[in-house]
Amino acid sequence: MAAEWASRFWLWATLLIPAAAVYEDQVGKFDWRQQYVGKVKFASLEFSPGSKKLVVATEKNVIAALNSRTGEILWRHVDKGTAEGAVDAMLLHGQDVITVSNGGRIMRSWETNIGGLNWEITLDSGSFQALGLVGLQESVRYIAVLKKTTLALHHLSSGHLKWVEHLPESDSIHYQMVYSYGSGVVWALGVVPFSHVNIVKFNVEDGEIVQQVRVSTPWLQHLSGACGVVDEAVLVCPDPSSRSLQTLALETEWELRQIPLQSLDLEFGSGFQPRVLPTQPNPVDASRAQFFLHLSPSHYALLQYHYGTLSLLKNFPQTALVSFATTGEKTVAAVMACRNEVQKSSSSEDGSMGSFSEKSSSKDSLACFNQTYTINLYLVETGRRLLDTTITFSLEQSGTRPERLYIQVFLKKDDSVGYRALVQTEDHLLLFLQQLAGKVVLWSREESLAEVVCLEMVDLPLTGAQAELEGEFGKKADGLLGMFLKRLSSQLILLQAWTSHLWKMFYDARKPRSQIKNEINIDTLARDEFNLQKMMVMVTASGKLFGIESSSGTILWKQYLPNVKPDSSFKLMVQRTTAHFPHPPQCTLLVKDKESGMSSLYVFNPIFGKWSQVAPPVLKRPILQSLLLPVMDQDYAKVLLLIDDEYKVTAFPATRNVLRQLHELAPSIFFYLVDAEQGRLCGYRLRKDLTTELSWELTIPPEVQRIVKVKGKRSSEHVHSQGRVMGDRSVLYKSLNPNLLAVVTESTDAHHERTFIGIFLIDGVTGRIIHSSVQKKAKGPVHIVHSENWVVYQYWNTKARRNEFTVLELYEGTEQYNATAFSSLDRPQLPQVLQQSYIFPSSISAMEATITERGITSRHLLIGLPSGAILSLPKALLDPRRPEIPTEQSREENLIPYSPDVQIHAERFINYNQTVSRMRGIYTAPSGLESTCLVVAYGLDIYQTRVYPSKQFDVLKDDYDYVLISSVLFGLVFATMITKRLAQVKLLNRAWR
């Protein structure tokens, strides 16, 4: 009988699944996806006027080709997100791109047109140092791979190993450079810090060591990043101690030659490590005799070393970035500098945005007061500036600086030099520039969106007419006649807006669909009828804030925080929504530095992206916890409480009205702190003088298990039904404790027989342990969702070697203790806890539950899979009350018979083929429709859509036949009128009889 009911259920479910799928005409109608590659690490641009792509490798372990005309991704390969997938080096030769990844363990060759893999080989173990192309007889044939102890030569066409040789004295010498220029030999250069340089020359054909030279360099610590090889194998190294350049011809010389810089009227910057920046356009030819010498953070010099003579071609005392590029026989140098005034790296920008902090990647550039830069080309042979090669561009965000410059040079029809420039800024913005007076910026890409750390959705404001109509209520001072006239004028304004909307619809209906432009303008943003269109406020790891319109993905505003350091943590809070007109909405961003522990507050308008006039408090101590209270000030802004490391409380805003409310509500304000290293959870309460008092403490032995996650409930969550009606018509009441915390622990012992996952349900007010359970032979990573009266968490079962879900549900029983008010201090009995586990056939990347405005709609779990798909799983499938043997009462409740396997159906994927690479999180928000939940999945890509867990029961479908129903209604009305007339005639005739 049970099997029969189970088969019936699965047949019923299978038939209903396609109804939740996306139809062909709905693709892209209410969803969108934006793909990114991340911060550029290496870039190679094709040098031809008709080139249509540029190949990049990024810090997100992505190799991709971008369309140079539009900036769109032509193809993309996403490697592992760990250090194993990191790209260590990249070289471009013809139509092939060579990459080395995984710390020098894997080398690949890619075809640049379609992104196909030509070949892949596994390299010998060892610390990777350098990669170079080796030419022979006017053609590039080999790839040289330099490691800590070996030098290997591989065939460019197949990747097969030609030879590998061990480097002499590799245990003490740090080999860091490899060089070849088609002469049949290849050099490996190593250094013993502050001692000497070792130069080993190998024969390309058989790998035999031809020559080995040792040169004393007591001032040199590193070769890479400081020295360079110029002209015909001449090693040039800057010597800050003697203020000179040291040169060594690798072919003929055995000792360094010193060339003082004073003879060229040049000087190194104090405390700055100078660098030599050479260029070798073709691996079969020698390097150019010209090179850049980086003297200070904003000082470059173009020098030439030829036949033992060093000469200054051009001095660039105020320069941001430089780059070389070659086309045909012409090699040019691109120089980026400020257009007018210059601001040093250590200066400050706008005080409201904080002061600059030095970043390792941006310390070698300067910033401009007006954020306007120019790029000019110079002929390297003479240092003469080429005419009509100036590109002037401006950066929108104050405080950001250019970090990298790549040049794409080509020859025009008149044999003059043309070029395009790829610029990457400090905030991970990619700009592709061209020489056009009308449109300098050909395209731009906001690659910081590849690393979103937190986001919130904010309702859009009402239109002016709607706001004026709302403002009528609650104002009786105008009198009856005044209110009537105001209502009349408001209705006329609404009628005018409706008429213009109808005219626009009629006008657009006459156009082809491709010509209809629905441009999103920040000045005309207004809430739609069902509140489906919202403002998405996103914060990225680089410290950049974005305002994105949710229905189209259009970036409406952006702000950059220049003093945010890497690995900082962020928390975004909405203090005031758009519901309190005329007060503007207000968001507060809390940024915490990981190293110092210090925090900063930034207050801004989430709709327009402007910094607020409200000055946030200056935080002088590290912040441990932040609380957004339901208490509001006189301007309807929620109060933010900040607790520092001395357990002192700071309120924002701290008006007299707020302090009075906090004084009254202090006994009912509780918070908790987590110290994962010590395994301590502490509960505190607020006193009336805004000090804190320890109310409870719980210690989990850190030598046995460590705290990995603490999950509370969403404060904006609504629960519609407080109980479940059972088969016998009794009610099983839910335990809806808003103060409940789900604490997940993991064993410190990594042995698969002794690992375990622990779950503790703790009351955050009293510290009472409501429930605890242990999953033996299990390990993380653990993903958890805590909502209403249930907790779902996922883990890896080491014994059965599979992923599993465990669901917990809490009930008070058939009698509700207090239906009007909840208090953690007045709960005599522990709730009943039901638990059940399920097998899931895949690991997961992220998990979240749907949420709606009133909580009436059924809940679904949105599960992000490693493949990039998002699975919408009904919570009813993870019900701990599912019976193994169905009974009459369970069938009455529509409980599904228990089956341990949770299957993945492709029809349940809400993003069909719009996969999200390397998904890190899923955000859900309610809309104005109870049936609709807004979903944003973010990772390397961003995907936004809508889901309907209980179908669209509150709105007509898109394919609703308005013409048919209208014609039927008109027909019925017409038939009623005719029937009425016929009945009157019949009655009249009957009366005359």
UniProtKB/Swiss-Prot annotation:
Subunit-structure text: Component of the ER membrane protein complex (EMC).
Organism lineage string: Eukaryota, Metazoa, Chordata, Craniata, Vertebrata
InterPro entries with a match to the protein in the record: EMC1, EMC1_C, Quinoprotein_ADH-like_sf, WD40/YVTN_repeat-like_dom_sf
Keywords linked to the UniProt accession: Disease variant, Disulfide bond, Endoplasmic reticulum, Glycoprotein, Membrane, Neurodegeneration, Signal, Transmembrane, Transmembrane helix
Gene name of the encoded protein: EMC1
Native organism: Homo sapiens (Human)
Membrane topology: Single-pass type I membrane protein
Function: Part of the endoplasmic reticulum membrane protein complex (EMC) that enables the energy-independent insertion into endoplasmic reticulum membranes of newly synthesized membrane proteins. Preferentially accommodates proteins with transmembrane domains that are weakly hydrophobic or contain destabilizing features such as charged and aromatic residues. Involved in the cotranslational insertion of multi-pass membrane proteins in which stop-transfer membrane-anchor sequences become ER membrane spanning helices.
Stated name of the protein: ER membrane protein complex subunit 1
GO biological process: protein insertion into ER membrane by stop-transfer membrane-anchor sequence; tail-anchored membrane protein insertion into ER membrane
Signal peptide as annotated in the record: 1-22
